[in-house]
Amino acid sequence: MKVLNNLLYTGDHEWVRVEDNKAYIGISDCAQRMLSDIVFVELPEVDDEIAKGETFATIESVKAASDSYMPVSGTIVEINEELEDNPAALNEDPYGSWIAAIEMSDKSELEELIKPEVYEKICEELDKEA
C-alpha cells in the first residue's frame, strides 16, 4: 500500500494535490484496494459548485458502489475524462489518475485534511483488519 508524502488525505480515502488555488482530487491506493476492480466512474460536471462533504463522484467496482466526497469547497474546473473509457486506471495508478480538479473557494479547509504520516497509520490499521 502506497501513501504519497506530497498529498493530503481524507478519512473517506480521497487524496488532494494542491497547485496554487486549484486542487486535484482522486482516491487513494488504500481505497482502490478496498474497492477491488473498478468498472465505472460517474464524474461531476465542469462548472459544478460543490461544497465540502458533498458527493462529487460515484465509483463502482465488482464489490460495491462508493460515493466520493469533496474534501474542499469550490467549482469543478476540470474532470479526468479518461476515466469514462478506462475506469480501471484508478486501480492501476490511483495517484496519477485524478478524478476532478476544483478551484477552491476556501483554502483554509485544507487544514482539516489528514497529513500523509497519519493517513498511512490509518491504512495500516485497515490492512490488519482485512
Curated annotation (Swiss-Prot):
Residue numbers of N6-lipoyllysine PTMs: 63
Lipoyl-binding domain residues are: 22-103
Q: Which Pfam families match?
A: GCV_H
Q: Which domain of life is it from?
A: Bacteria
Q: Which cofactor does it need?
A: (R)-lipoate
**Task of the protein:** The glycine cleavage system catalyzes the degradation of glycine. The H protein shuttles the methylamine group of glycine from the P protein to the T protein.
Give the family per the record. Answer: Belongs to the GcvH family.
Q: What is this protein called?
A: Glycine cleavage system H protein
